[in-house]
Amino acid sequence: FEDFIKEKTGFDHYIQASRNNKVMHILLDESGDPKKILSCKRAKYDFTEKIMPIIRKFPKMKDANEKILSEDWFGNDHLDRLNINHVKLALDWLTNFQNNTSSGSFDSHDIEEEVENLKSELDRIEEIHNLPYHKCLDEYKQHVSAIKFKKTAVHGDFQVRNILVNQDNLSVNVIDWSAFMEKGNPLIDFLALAGSMIFQGSDSVEECRSNLRGTGKAVPALKLIKKTMNEYFQADLDFIILLRFRVLKILLRNFKTKRTSTDYFTYVELFRMLSEIN
């Protein structure tokens, strides 16, 4: 497969990044600079496949139904969560994206449906039966129902590894649109960004705990995200309630995609820790 990629693209060097349902290849020129991204579905290949170039333009953001997709690389590097200027650029990109794609209200009916569907799915996971996920989701529903939201387009996986920053012109490019929704919950992308800031490290539970206590590496980024969300949504948001919701959604995703037991149980423990915070 490596020879096939080299022959089809003309690039001899690349970096692989594994995702749930695909493998991404970042193609490098002779100087080692990224030039293109290939998204290759996890499937059988007979090496007659064509590489389909794509240019994303709203609302057609999702991946086309082809095995191999090619996009130009529009960044210097992935977002650095410890660089507050990078975080601000990502937040500016997200608020502009939501302002430009907002539509009708994300009302109490939408929130009720979202929460009840999540409860029903989580009921299948034995490892959390003794944890108060129903109670935490009811708290989430009560909390966000009091806030006026508009539906917006949702990237669906707006986290550090999918955000590229161009240092030359201080612009942002976002990759991996496989979970894109044209209309959805505007909180999802903010919480994905926050989670990817504070759940990192060899011990994600302790990393999260230290960031929430105000002693972790990502505290400046977390403060900026909180401030931006409160101003953008014109509300006093309870971040613990929102993070519980985020962790439960990741836990369900990992359960469905049969992720490694280490990754899976990390989120069980993250939710356990968050559920114990008053």
What positions do the PLM features span?
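Juxta-kinase regulatory segment immediately upstream of eukaryotic protein kinase catalytic domains
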Residues: 1-16
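ATP-binding glycine-rich loop module of kinase domains
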Residues: 20-49, 72
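Active-site acidic catalytic loop and adjacent metal/ATP-binding pocket
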Residues: 24-27, 142-188
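Hydrophobic residues embedded in beta-strands of well-ordered beta-sheets
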Residues: 34, 69, 170-172
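Conserved kinase catalytic-core helix
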Residues: 46-63, 77-118, 133-153, 161
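Conserved short submotifs of the Hanks-type protein kinase catalytic core
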Residues: 68-76
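Active-site Asp-x-Gly
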Residues: 168-215
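Helix-rich C-terminal or lid/interface subdomains of diverse kinases
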Residues: 192-195, 209-278
